């Protein structure tokens, strides 16, 4: 998993560890087990442990919304992107679009750096940079995701919920509920 040393540039290690968790979850691991494993393997400062936890759980919780952003910002739909790239972009987009205290430059630069040093992703570092900078421009312009026409799909995308759940919710509460 993580090949970074503890002397890696500031902020890179927590983001790498969160990315490792996302990849493990995509491969079938339970999020809490994957997170506990990466945190146990490193002696991190409490602030770094908190950042790893927030990035991993946040990106997992917001996966559908982050995929919708990738579909909007990228040339290739999220589902067709290489998984490692997709999860790295989720870490970057989560910081840019859903966290308030992370400097934009830190979110973009660390994601690009992680792509550069990752086997198989180095050539895609410009893609990471381009997608994240497009997200910044979109955010600064006040643009939001276009929502689908039907209410269950709107709720699912806006709140990163499964379709079956929002369909049941609308059936239970009605379209006006």
Predicted regions: what they are:
Residues 1-177:
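Class I Rossmann-like S-adenosyl-L-methionine
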């Amino acid at each position: 998993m993580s090949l970074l040393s503890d002397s890696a540039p500031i902020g890179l290690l927590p983001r790498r560890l969160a990315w490792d968790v996302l990849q493990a979850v995509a491969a079938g691991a339970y999020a809490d087990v994957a997170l506990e494993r990466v945190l146990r393997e490193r002696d991190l400062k409490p602030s770094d442990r908190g950042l790893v936890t927030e990035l991993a759980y946040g990106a997992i919780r917001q996966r559908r919304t982050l995929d919708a952003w990738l579909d909007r910002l990228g040339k290739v739909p999220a589902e067709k992107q290489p998984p490692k790239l997709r999860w790295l972009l989720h870490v970057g987009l989560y910081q840019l679009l859903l966290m308030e205290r992370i400097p934009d430059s830190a979110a973009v630069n660390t994601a690009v750096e992680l792509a550069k040093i990752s086997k198989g992703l180095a050539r895609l570092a410009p893609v990471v940079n381009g997608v994240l900078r497009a997200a910044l421009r979109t955010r600064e312009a006040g643009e939001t995701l276009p929502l689908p026409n039907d209410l269950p799909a709107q709720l699912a995308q806006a709140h990163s919920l499964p379709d079956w759940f929002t369909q049941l919710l609308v059936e239970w509460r009605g379209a006006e509920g």
